[in-house]
UniProtKB/Swiss-Prot annotation:
InterPro entries: AceGlu_kinase-like_sf, Asp/Glu/Uridylate_kinase, G5K_ProB, Glu/AcGlu_kinase, Glu_5kinase, Glu_5kinase/COase_Synthase, Glutamate_5-kinase_CS, PUA
Species this chain originates from: Neisseria meningitidis serogroup C / serotype 2a (strain ATCC 700532 / DSM 15464 / FAM18)
Protein name: Glutamate 5-kinase
Record localization: Cytoplasm
This protein's GO CC annotations: cytosol
Pathway the protein takes part in: Amino-acid biosynthesis; L-proline biosynthesis; L-glutamate 5-semialdehyde from L-glutamate: step 1/2
UniProt-annotated binding residues for ATP: K9, T168, D169, T210, G211, G212, M213, L214, T215, K216
Taxonomic lineage: Bacteria, Pseudomonadati, Pseudomonadota, Betaproteobacteria, Neisseriales
Keyword Ribosomal protein attached: no
Pfam families per UniProt: AA_kinase, PUA
Gene3D superfamilies, per database record: Acetylglutamate kinase-like, PUA domain
Task performed by this protein: Catalyzes the transfer of a phosphate group to glutamate to form L-glutamate 5-phosphate.
Amino acid sequence: MKYKRIVFKVGTSSITHSDGSLSRGKIQTITRQLAALHHAGHELVLVSSGAVAAGFGALGFKKRPVKIADKQASAAVGQGLLMEEYTANLSSDGIVSAQILLSRADFADKRRYQNAGGALSVLLQRRAVPIINENDTVSVEELKIGDNDTLSAQVAAMIQADLLVLLTDIDGLYTGNPNSNPDAVRLDKIEHINHEIIEMAGGSGSANGTGGMLTKIKAATIAAESGVPVYICSSLKPDALAEAAEHQADGSFFVPRAKGLRTQKQWLAFYSESRGSVYVDEGAEHALSEQGKSLLMSGIAGIEGHFSRMDTVTVYSKATKQPLGKGRVLFGSAAAEDLLKSRKAKGVFIHRDDWISITPEIRLLLTEF
């Protein structure tokens, strides 16, 4: 078995008709493949869009709504209908499914993050198939994860999956838009995600979904940095899921970081919300970036913002003003400033176990998406 624990993400276009309504036939194609993989011993998680698509018709809308309240109402109806389809299909093969609705707050709060990961682990151990979506009905727009590509990568990293498969209506990442550029070539293997890759992914996706190729590259970055390989491939092939599970998919494969980030480091890098800014001198910058040491109070050159003990802050170079990383502090801002003024600034401010350096890939996530 090439990959045992796999997260599959299906977009709205992969489970709907051209008019945006839910396609039971497409869902059956996906669940049939999931059932075969499950019976072969794989541990599976499905991140599925489509709640709005499943619900807008039932509420009398002629087409997919645009207003936030209309979309949230459609999602409230559609999520139940969507789960009904998945549950009916999987239960006919003797498989228990579970619904989990997540929001950005479930990742930003460390305890909720750990609880979600624990629940998913139990479900997988008990051979259930978790079906995950963002909690669209109650999510505030500015506090949303925003797309299920990103959500699937966050889930894959959280549960230390062996593979993330992003299923779409496009069979991978191309050097240009294959619909308008006959010279566009698919990239079958991507070892590093950089500005050039992001530029290639700049086009928009299907009219019915929100996850274009750019969000898939963002997802691939999160997963690959966490040590999870990623496939982007078409859901239209009848055996797409099985082929991906055996590393034979017809799509684009993203090579993971050789030593993926541990769960604590993932949380710091991708989900923790920075409560302040700390500037450090050249000696501290070298100790953090080159030697993997803790940040000492004596290396702090300046503090901005108000934060408490064990809050996350972003650390910057005083010389270049560039971000060096993020960490959880052992002193609140008021106490730290008092110590600095008294010239008695001794001890550890951020322990190296609570520190993550900003790699080029993480910097791309912070600046490009």
